Amino acid sequence: MKIAVDAMGGDHAPKEIVLGVMKAVAQYKDIEILLFGDETKINEYLTDKTRVKIIHTDEKIESDDEPVRAVKRKKKASMVLAAQAVKDGEADACISAGNTGALMSTGLFVIGRIKGIDRPALAPTLPTVTGKGFVMLDLGANAEAKPEHLLQFGLMGSVYAEKVRKIDRPRVALLNIGTEETKGNDLTKKSFELMKNQDAYEFIGNIEARDLLMDVADVVVTDGFTGNMVLKSIEGTGAAFLSMLKMSLLNGFKNKVAASFLKKDLMELKAKMDYSEYGGACLFGVQAPVVKAHGSSNANGIFTTIRQVREMVEKQVVETIKAEVDKVKVGGTEAND
């Protein structure tokens, strides 16, 4: 199994990318890594070249580059070359911690969309109070969506949850402002109707945002605009809560003593809410596994993303989506590439 990795994408590239790769090849003897980027900089952190190949390029996509323009103009960028390796059959999947929009554009323009899938979807696994986590899509690939798209999102998320997260018959829910079937706008009402009348996956109905982290669903479907706001709200709320908790525990001698006894429990709580432990965000709907690692990923974050991609390839997630897509085909959907 060969995995193409953009060594130059992310806040801590290439150091943390390379260190994560080193950890992965040491752990998994069945993978080979193709590292795309500045060879001199990569070699500074490369401690073992076993099953690691460097493909040198000086070009990279910056975090503030306009995604589509950058992908079209920077043909030799590390991210683009990693995707091209997948397109050419030289790698089975690709990973980048770089510009999210550029990676989505690269996935669509270079690797290509699955026939029968109208829109791709960005899908991370988010934490729950039980530590189990849930897959949520779309979180930003599409600002607007149609009911047919959300129907397909449910299928893609369900396949991933079953194959990679090892959940038998995953519970798929639709994000809405209420649990009743009649609640919501035109998009959610029509999506509910389509999802209710299919048998490709287990649809359990609507879910409210306040219940997302309570482990009531394994897959949650929404449009990209709403999903991205939910993600940022969860991130911001979590960070604010931890900050307030820290200030409270360090305020006064008694609280500091209590904090010393609670340190281990608090660290476990923080780890449980750290969704980087689940890997990166999958770009579903393209012809091969493409995963966006968090931009601030450290070596462990890259390692967990490689582990995630390895599972996707091994369990044939993309192939299963291709085989199952006709089960959620709706008359009048868009033509595909």
From Swiss-Prot:
Q: Name one Pfam family in it.
A: FA_synthesis
The protein's superkingdom reads: Bacteria
GO cellular component assignments: cytoplasm
| The keyword Transferase belongs to this UniProt entry's keyword annotation | yes
The molecular function GO annotations come to: phosphate:acyl-[acyl carrier protein] acyltransferase activity
Where does it localize?
Cytoplasm
Q: Which cysteines are joined by disulfide bonds?
A: none
Q: Does the keyword Lipid metabolism apply?
A: yes
GO biological process terms held by the UniProt record: fatty acid biosynthetic process; phospholipid biosynthetic process
The EC number(s) this enzyme carries? 2.3.1.274
User: What sort of enzyme, by top EC class, is this?
Assistant: transferase
Catalytic function, reaction form: a fatty acyl-[ACP] + phosphate = an acyl phosphate + holo-[ACP]
Q: Which UniProt keywords apply?
A: Cytoplasm, Lipid biosynthesis, Lipid metabolism, Phospholipid biosynthesis, Phospholipid metabolism, Transferase
Q: Which HAMAP family is this protein grouped with? A: PlsX (MF_00019)
**PANTHER family, sorted:** FATTY ACID/PHOSPHOLIPID SYNTHESIS PROTEIN PLSX, PHOSPHATE ACYLTRANSFERASE
Subunit structure, interactors included: Homodimer. Probably interacts with PlsY.
Q: Which family does it belong to?
A: Belongs to the PlsX family.
Instruction: Quote the NCBIfam families the UniProt record gives.
Output: plsX (TIGR00182)
Question: Function of this protein?
Answer: Catalyzes the reversible formation of acyl-phosphate (acyl-PO(4)) from acyl-[acyl-carrier-protein] (acyl-ACP). This enzyme utilizes acyl-ACP as fatty acyl donor, but not acyl-CoA.
In Swiss-Prot or TrEMBL terms, this protein is called Phosphate acyltransferase
Q: Which organism is it from?
A: Listeria welshimeri serovar 6b (strain ATCC 35897 / DSM 20650 / CCUG 15529 / CIP 8149 / NCTC 11857 / SLCC 5334 / V8)
UniProt lists the gene as: plsX
